[in-house]
Amino acid sequence: MSRGDKMLKFEVKARDGAGRIGKLEVNGKKIETPAIMPVVNPKQLIVEPKELEKMGFDIIITNSYIIYKDRELREKALEVGIHKLLGYDGIIEVDSGSFQLMRYGNVDVSNREIVEFQHRIGVDIGTFLDIPTPPDAPKEKAMEDLKITLERAREAEEIKEIAMNAAIQGSTYTDLRRYAARRLSSMNFEIHPIGGVVPLLEAYRFREVVDIVISSKMALRPDRPVHLFGAGHPMVFALAVAMGVDLFDSASYALYAKDDRYLTPEGTKRLDELEYFPCSCPVCSRYTPQELREMPKEERARLLAIHNLWVIKEEIERIKQAIREGELWRLVDERARSHPKLYSAYKRLLDHYTFLEEFEPVTKKSAVFKISHESLRWPLVRRARERAERVNSKFGDLVEHPIFGKVTKYLTLTYPFAQSEAEDEFSIEKPTRENAIRYVMAIAEYQFGENASKAFEGAEVELARTGMPRQVKLNGKRLATVRAEDGFLTLGIEGAKRLHKVLEYPRMRVVVSEEAEPFARKGKDVFAKFVLFADPGIRPYDEVLVVNEKDELLATGQALMSGREMIVFQYGRAVKVRRGISGG
């Protein structure tokens, strides 16, 4: 698998669930993801692109086919470029006419023509002419459409001179979605939209959208952003981000406004139903529903569109804050209760545990709250229960936890067992000087896996004034520190060396290139582009061992990605190195 190219840069800055806050850069312009692209129709500008830019929308999407088919727009775009045509300086992505193809059955342009046209008018992110097969089409039809899409992808790959989308199609057949994702992952594209889902979203078939997105994500390389084509209603954003969607586009802000519909994070309301505005955006702060109803239709539609945009933007910001705080699943749980079909989709997403668990951080800033039956199925909770079962059999002394069930008391100081809240109280038994080492060994077994406890045999544990274990030492040398915030172990140099001997290769290893070795030894962070291999079992925020190709220990630190991501990503930090280990 290639490491990609430099037309577009994408790196992950924070994460929760499969959701991520990323930095996307193209043509020297940067945005933070998750991001929403307002759809701009150059023939019907309900909100001017310049105003969108002032509102903080640093990326928009428009339709290159509409521009291509309109002689006046086409000639002007070719003369001055798309940015001057629209009066917008941010990132401009374009669709190719695929949506028109799905809606109306044909478009009067070839794949090569539209790709070359996109380059000539200076778009930042283009899209080739894929075939979006409608839901429930015969499988033979979906297969034939996908065959054409992949042929056009190969053609676009050969001629493209800009960053480009490669949409994953396949109708409602998850095996075709996986196949398309694998094939397109092997090609030189930058972003992967998941296409053909608008009819499903319009019909509230969110459960099927979950299966389509997860099937696609499972086969996609994880270093490329994913765009859920046509998903523009804020009620689905949190769920989609938890699946790993990075980009959205919204025409709904304008379409709903023209129909006197008012967006909220939970759904849509008709303007004539409202006595009060449940919002404090500039529009809702200035006008009452009655005042908007009395306005001329064109002005009313413009103001409703601006409100709808603020609601969309606010929900994206709320999601990003939830990711930062480790609270994304709580937000998804809350939003899912706005509609039975969304609730069904949320439950379906939790069925995809194997996919979700790979990206789920092992520790978070937030406590685990038992707020619903579904919260007991969150990936972090399920994983903690599975790991605890393994440790329980070795350490015994079980206690009943209101969220995690039977857990050895030696894990009850550690995240998430200690950092959790349920209806029933759970008391923590502090260690004694005599049994504190049992706590440390159980934590090691839970944190690093089978037999990791052997690295701490014979060690002594110093207790803090609070009675909690802190420093773990052997013969006066520090092996590890038990972190106050989450009860996990941060390795010292001696602890890393002992763990390295105990754990067979490649467990908890991140293998770096010869070029990165001297920097790792000096305690410098490891960047993903220098990672040659990593233990697939590594999860975000695990404590890991950095080694060279000879399995010589170079450093210890905290993983910022899963093991598989480290191998694929070209940009961003893979390991936050805590301590380097000098050679010799």
UniProtKB/Swiss-Prot annotation:
Entry EC number(s): 2.4.2.48
Cited CDD domains: PUA_archaeosine_TGT
A Pfam family this chain is assigned to: TGT
Active site: 95
SMART domains: PUA
GO cellular component: cytoplasm
Keyword presence, Glycosyltransferase: yes
Domain PUA: 507-582
Organism this protein belongs to: Pyrococcus abyssi (strain GE5 / Orsay)
Gene Ontology biological process: tRNA wobble guanine modification
Pathway the protein contributes to: tRNA modification; archaeosine-tRNA biosynthesis
Function, in words: Exchanges the guanine residue with 7-cyano-7-deazaguanine (preQ0) at position 15 in the dihydrouridine loop (D-loop) of archaeal tRNAs.
Cofactor note as given: Binds 1 zinc ion per subunit.
PROSITE patterns linked to this entry: PUA (PS50890)
Gene Ontology molecular functions: pentosyltransferase activity; RNA binding; zinc ion binding
InterPro entries membership: ArchSynthase1/Queuine_TRR, ArcTGT_C1_sf, PUA, PUA-like_sf, PUA_sf, TGT-like_sf, TGT_C1, TGT_C2
Reaction(s) catalysed (UniProt annotation): guanosine(15) in tRNA + 7-cyano-7-deazaguanine = 7-cyano-7-carbaguanosine(15) in tRNA + guanine
EC class: transferase
Swiss-Prot/TrEMBL keywords: Glycosyltransferase, Metal-binding, Transferase, tRNA processing, Zinc
Lineage: Archaea, Methanobacteriati, Methanobacteriota, Thermococci, Thermococcales
The family this protein is said to belong to: Belongs to the archaeosine tRNA-ribosyltransferase family.
Binding, Zn(2+): 279, 281, 284
SUPFAM superfamilies associated with the record: Pre-PUA domain, PUA domain-like, tRNA-guanine transglycosylase
Protein name per the record: tRNA-guanine(15) transglycosylase
Binding-site list for substrate: 130, 196
HAMAP family: TgtA_arch
